[in-house]
Regions:
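Structural preference for alpha-helix termini/caps and helix-kink/transition segments
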Residues: 277-279, 283-473
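N-terminal, positively charged nucleic-acid-binding surface of large information/translation enzymes
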Residues: 9, 18-114, 463-465, 469-470
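Short, glycine/charge-rich beta-strand/loop segments that flank catalytic centers
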Residues: 64-70, 101-106, 116-131, 149-158
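The substrate-binding groove and active-site-proximal loops of carbohydrate-active enzymes
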Residues: 88-94, 119-125, 209, 238
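Short phosphate-binding/catalytic loops that engage adenosine nucleotides
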Residues: 59, 143, 458
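Alpha-helical recognition segments enriched in aromatics with Gly/Pro capping
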Residues: 1-33, 48, 108, 128-339
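Short glycine/serine- and small hydrophobic-enriched flexible loop segments
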Residues: 52, 224-225, 383
Length: 473
């Protein structure tokens, strides 16, 4: 049975879904004001592995991942500009155009990294009615109060506040660096609806005046709407957002539900550069697109799953080169097996030893998704297979058996091993979109997609008869 580490209980627990055979999973997605970096990539690959292993285990997953397109302020302490509006002013375009642009960019990254698309990808700007209704319920239950057009959640009304992050309210108040907002009854109270100044671009009418939602209320309202207005199985996200974001989500949602928001809190750890967290604020980040110019998407994915999702990953050229070498080892192994499997049947008997590796693979994955150990099992299988190949002791039937086993477990790893010269499906999709743009004479869009291909390390050439060719640079 799968055991998952639950950040809420701080222990590994047996995973049992609320509804037999089905899993509800909500993952906090990126704030879309720039291209995703490898820290984002690490997290969403980790959640993809979780989803894939649940599906491998026979469960149907209802996967929600939002895109935050309003309400995430530059400072988490509810001061400063909205991150998307700030970028919109720099680029002198509408903030929703900014959001659209970077959602499209994120989708390209996720396709390249072979991350399965979520079943639903809600955006707060399209859920304003549901968010307002959620805030109204909080007010009706006396968990929130309105002051001069803004609405605040009353932390003292929720005695369990701090249970996810392990913080208590007294320490939070004494350690607060935030100037006290006179509108708040308690310094820890946080905004669920924010009064919009005249210059604010994204704003909506509400029972409390013109404003916009706070960052934290968005996830509570959208998960409530899309996961049955009840407790759901798994909430995923980055460990750095445990406080205040996830903590505030719990307070809001459990105030309405009167029971747990989610049974499991599965949080991934950060990526570091020279021991320092990779982040946009420190300008020490590498975008997924820049990394893809140097490395095959499967190399990046293998680099991620070579570490446990709860451990810190150090980003370096050395680490990526090691992943590249390991992918080459896997690729050569698969290629050799395919060559043998394609041969005519021989007289050698089939040796079925994959069940041993299958058991060990599942034991590793059942232990809180221990992908490093699961990969080590595969590397051992590669070594054993190569020994048998070298000694001419591997039959065609055995090769086919091993290939079949690899295909099953690679549905969990999600490593796309391209044949030499083969263009990934995600790159082909962009090529088709560019062709459609050219056919409709949308040349600015065509040029934009050509530039995107270049960013991803591919060149496109227009040929006769309205065809095209894509090549790796």
């Amino acid at each position: 049975m799968l055991k998952l580490y639950n950040t809420l209980s701080k222990t590994k627990e047996d995973f049992k879904s609320i509804n037999p055979g089905k899993v509800g999973m909500y993952v906090c997605g990126p704030t879309v004001y720039d291209h995703c970096h490898l820290g984002h990539g690490r997290g969403y690959v980790a959640m993809d592995i979780l989803r894939r292993y649940l599906e491998y285990s026979g469960l149907e997953v209802r996967h929600i991942m939002n895109y935050t397109d309003v309400g995430h302020l530059v400072d988490n302490a509810e001061v400063g500009e909205d991150k998307i509006e700030k970028k919109a002013k720099i680029e002198k375009i509408d903030p929703l155009v900014i959001a659209d642009k970077y959602i499209e960019s994120a989708e390209e990254d996720f396709v390249a990294l072979n991350i399965k698309p979520a079943n639903f990808k809600p955006r707060p700007t399209r859920y304003i009615a549901q968010i307002i209704a959620f805030v109204e319920m909080l007010i009706q239950k006396s968990y929130a109060y309105e002051v001069d057009g803004s609405v605040y959640f009353s932390v003292e009304k929720f005695p369990e506040y701090g249970k996810l992050s392990g913080r208590n309210t007294e320490d939070l108040i004494s350690g607060s660096r935030v100037e006290i907002n006179p509108d708040k009854r308690n310094p820890l109270d946080f905004a669920v609806w924010i009064k919009a100044p005249k210059e604010h671009l994204l704003k909506w009418n509400s029972p409390w005046g013109v404003g916009y939602p706070g960052w934290h209320i968005e996830c509570s309202a959208m998960s409530y709407d899309l996961l049955g207005q009840d407790t759901f199985d798994i909430h995923g996200g980055g460990n750095e957002n445990k406080f205040p974001h996830n903590e505030n989500e719990i307070a809001q949602s459990e105030a309405i539900l009167g029971k747990p928001m989610a049974n499991f809190w599965t949080l991934w750890n950060m990526v570091t550069v020279d021991g320092v967290k990779m982040s946009k604020s420190l300008n020490n980040f590498t975008t997924i697109k820049d990394a893809l110019k140097k490395y095959d998407p499967a190399v990046i994915r293998l680099w991620v799953i070579s570490s446990h999702y709860r451990s810190i990953i150090g980003y370096s050229g050395k680490a990526l080169e090691q992943a590249k070498e390991n992918l080459r080892k896997i690729s050569d192994w698969v290629s050799n097996l395919k060559d043998l499997a394609a041969a005519k049947s021989d007289s050698s008997s089939e040796i079925d030893f994959t069940h041993i590796y299958k058991k060990r693979f599942e034991e590793a994955m059942d232990d809180d998704l221990n992908t490093p150990i699961a990969l080590a099992v595969i590397y051992e299988l590669i070594t054993e297979t190569n020994r048998l190949l070298a000694e001419n002791k591997l039959s065609v039937a055995t090769a086919k058996n091993i290939l079949g086993y690899w295909e099953k477990i690679n549905k969990v790893f999600g490593l796309i091993i391209e044949a030499k010269g083969e263009i990934p499906a995600g790159i082909q999709k962009i090529g088709e979109e560019r062709k459609m743009a050219r056919d409709s004479k949308d040349f600015p869009k065509s040029d934009e997609l050509r530039d995107r291909l270049a960013e991803l390390g591919y060149a496109i050439e227009d040929l006769k008869d309205n065809n095209y060719s894509i090549k790796k640079k």
